[in-house]
C-alpha cells in the first residue's frame, strides 16, 4: 500500500517525490503532506542537511565566479619609472649655473588614478651665494608606487666651502656641531627608513675673476656631487637637512615638506 501511494505521488507531484526521497535518505523524518502547493511543500521539507549542501554549493559558485573580478580590482599598471640617466640629466639642467636652459618636458611618473602617491611635495631647490662661494642644490623625489621612493640630490658649487645635504627625521635638531649632525636617535630609527643608494663627487679647479674685485684673478674650486636616497616603509616624515660652511659664511637649515598635503592624517611634530 505504501508503494502505491508513492507511485501516485510520483505521477501527480514529481517534484515532491524527489525532495521527499532525498529527505528520507538523509534522516527519514519527513512526513507526507496533506495539502498545499509545491512551493509550500519545498518550504517545509527543506532539511538542515539539504540547506547546508545547497548554500555551500551556492557560495562556491558565487566566489568561483568572482575570483577574476577581485584580481582585476586589485591590480594596477606598473608606473613608468624614470631611468637613472633621465634623473641625473634633469638635475644637471637645473643646476647649470653658467647657461641656464629650459627644463625638458618630463614624462609622467605614474598613471592618474591607479594608486595614491606617498609624497607630493615635488622638486627641491636651494640657492646660496656669498662672496667666496656660489652654491645651487636641486633635488627630486620619485615615488615608485610600491611602498618605496627615491630622493635625488645634485649640488653644484664654485668657490671654497663644505656642503652637506642629507635626509633626517623631523625631530632632528638644527645645530652647527658637525660631530652630531649624522646621529639619529634610536626612537627615530623606527620611523625613518632611508639609506644612501648612490653617491659621487667630482672636483675641478680653475682661475676666474674674483667676485669682490673683478680686476683680480682668484683661484676657485668647482664641485659637483650626486647622491640618491632610497626610503621605504615604515616612516612618518622626512626632512632635508643642509649644512654649509665657508670661511665667511655658515648655514644650517632643515626643510620639511608639507605633510598635510600628501597624507589624510595630519602630522603634528613633537620633541
Swiss-Prot record:
GO BP field: modulation of chemical synaptic transmission
Signal peptide: 1-21
Gene source species: Homo sapiens (Human)
UniProt similarity note: Belongs to the neurexophilin family.
Location(s), subcellular: Secreted
Region (II), start-end ranges: 22-97
One annotated GO molecular function: signaling receptor binding
Region feature III, mapped onto this chain: 98-176
Residues with glycosylation annotation: 23, 68, 93, 146, 156, 162
GO (cellular component) term, any one: glutamatergic synapse
Region annotation (IV (linker domain)) ranges: 177-185
Chain segments annotated as transmembrane: none
Name of the protein in question: Neurexophilin-1
Function per UniProt: May be signaling molecules that resemble neuropeptides and that act by binding to alpha-neurexins and possibly other receptors.
Annotated spans, V (Cys-rich): 186-271
Amino acid at each position: 500500500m505504501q508503494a502505491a501511494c508513492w507511485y501516485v505521488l510520483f505521477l501527480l507531484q514529481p517534484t515532491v517525490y524527489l525532495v521527499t526521497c532525498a529527505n528520507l535518505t538523509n534522516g527519514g523524518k519527513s512526513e507526507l503532506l496533506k495539502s498545499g502547493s509545491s512551493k509550500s511543500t519545498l518550504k517545509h521539507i527543506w532539511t538542515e542537511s539539504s540547506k547546508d549542501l545547497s548554500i555551500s554549493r551556492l557560495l562556491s559558485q558565487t566566489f568561483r565566479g568572482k575570483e577574476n573580478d577581485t584580481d582585476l580590482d586589485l591590480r594596477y599598471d606598473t608606473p613608468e619609472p624614470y631611468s637613472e640617466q633621465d634623473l641625473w640629466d634633469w638635475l644637471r639642467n637645473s643646476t647649470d649655473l653658467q647657461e641656464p636652459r629650459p627644463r625638458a618636458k618630463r614624462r609622467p611618473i605614474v598613471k592618474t588614478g591607479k594608486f595614491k602617491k606617498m609624497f607630493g611635495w615635488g622638486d627641491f631647490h636651494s640657492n646660496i651665494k656669498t662672496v667666496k662661494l656660489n652654491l645651487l642644490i636641486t633635488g627630486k623625489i620619485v615615488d615608485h608606487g610600491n611602498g618605496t621612493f627615491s630622493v635625488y640630490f645634485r649640488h653644484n658649487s664654485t668657490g671654497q666651502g663644505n656642503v652637506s645635504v642629507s635626509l633626517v627625521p623631523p625631530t632632528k635638531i638644527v645645530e652647527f656641531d658637525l660631530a652630531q649632525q649624522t646621529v639619529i636617535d634610536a626612537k627615530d630609527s623606527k620611523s625613518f627608513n632611508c639609506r644612501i643608494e648612490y653617491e659621487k663627487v667630482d672636483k675641478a679647479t680653475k682661475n676666474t675673476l674674483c667676485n669682490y674685485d673683478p680686476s683680480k684673478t682668484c683661484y676657485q674650486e668647482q664641485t659637483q656631487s650626486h647622491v640618491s636616497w632610497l626610503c621605504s616603509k615604515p616612516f612618518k616624515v622626512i626632512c632635508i637637512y643642509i649644512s654649509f660652511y665657508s670661511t665667511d659664511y655658515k648655514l644650517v637649515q632643515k626643510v620639511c615638506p608639507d605633510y598635510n598635503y600628501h597624507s589624510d592624517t595630519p602630522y603634528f611634530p613633537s620633541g
